[in-house]
């Protein structure tokens, strides 16, 4: 009898563990922009929701309420409307409500910092894992928008390796090109 009770208890525990797992309502959102602080001049934080057709994003701030819509799984905020919202809500916390169909609903916050971000960043554009290094570009991106500008392309220099090193605090920056036509460009305070 004692063994039978133990078997029933174990069976009950096993069956209880077979229930469906609760799903995270934001498992399909990419990138995850939930509960963050953003600079007051940052480019729109566009995002995707997997398998969503129509998406509604309602943003509530102290100075207003803003409505955005997404289609085919993509929320792409209009740049002017986005920047107007950030200017109006600088220093405030925004509540963001996202709805996609009946199964995808949740809220999160964005705190709009009073500090702005530096407008430009530069980076070396290369295939992942450095496996195809022959196609290297040095680009500059305006982080308040999505505009990019090509600064260098190794296809114009016999496919030589390009290293771009920029420093913060407006110090000396340099770009180095390896190979038979290699060289280095030094920049200090905007002067080459």
Kindly give the residue locations of the regions a language model identified.
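Bacterial N-terminal signal peptides that target proteins for export
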Residues: 1-7
